[in-house]
Curated annotation (Swiss-Prot):
Catalyzed reaction equations: GTP + H2O = 7,8-dihydroneopterin 3'-triphosphate + formate + H(+)
Biological role: Converts GTP to 7,8-dihydroneopterin triphosphate.
Domain of life: Bacteria
Protein name from the UniProt record: GTP cyclohydrolase FolE2
Gene3D superfamilies associated with the record: Urate Oxidase
Biological processes per GO annotation: tetrahydrofolate biosynthetic process
Pfam families, per database record: GCHY-1
Positions bearing the site annotation: May be catalytically important: C155
Family, as annotated: Belongs to the GTP cyclohydrolase IV family.
EC identifiers of the protein: 3.5.4.16
Amino acid sequence: MTTSMPDIANHTTAQTEGTLDWVGMSNIEMPIMVASKGESERMVSAHIDAFVNLKDAQAKGIHMSRLYLLIDELSTSNILNYQSLVSLLDGFISSHQELSDQAKVQFCFDYHLRRKSLISGKEGWKAYPVTLTGNLNQGKLTIELTIDVPYSSTCPCSAALARQLIQKAFQDKFAQQSELALTDVHDWLGTTEGIVATPHSQRSVAEVKVKLNSSINDFPITEIVDLVENSLKTPVQAAVKREDEQEFARLNGQNLMFCEDAARRLQHSLNQTDQFDDFWLRINHLESLHAHDAVSVTTKGIKDGYQP
């Protein structure tokens, strides 16, 4: 004798009536094949959040397994790009026709890129945290890409103070000499006595969020990373030889920046490209001098766009 299994979500009503903004699952772990412009398709280990709204005040609940199976189908049979993300959101809603008219999904993963060293030509892997978010609200679509890009920042104020101490050390060393030989100054500058102080610097992170449109299919992950690193000039390195470390020191010295400077550089660069409908960025200088971070936030500044 065949026994049918009870389906509580379909055949019972809510004990207390009410609509719900979002119902679903968070932190689903799945391998996902990602398409990034200019890169070969590659598998990433993603943490996924999937939700729909519950507009039927009397319905017991949504069908979470339907959301899960749609994501699993993407994982096993498709590639994550702009169009497949839109199709996934459509599937969330069509699988809950009487219950939902809104859907959202978020994929969080590290995207690894091969990055060349500054001088030696050596290469190494760097991992960039990426968040892809899709939201479909009564036919209105929003697709967002967020990337964290690490770099080094050296404090302009600290650099000025260090230069002052070096000047004083130079004066103390050579004040009594009426004539100076170039070799004496050259040799002195190569000692720890000559470089008596160095400015403080720290690893920093630029969080860049852009709003994408249908003109993009493969996600511009590498393009955004390149834009940030080329604008700020001091990217955190992977493989490093001594000549690379020396060049890194030079770049830091030639690109002194407060968090405000970094934010304005990226704001200018992002304003030069028209492929993003909107952008939001946050600069985080993880201070080595202070026990707090220095932060700057800015947006494209369009009407009804991102807010700081």
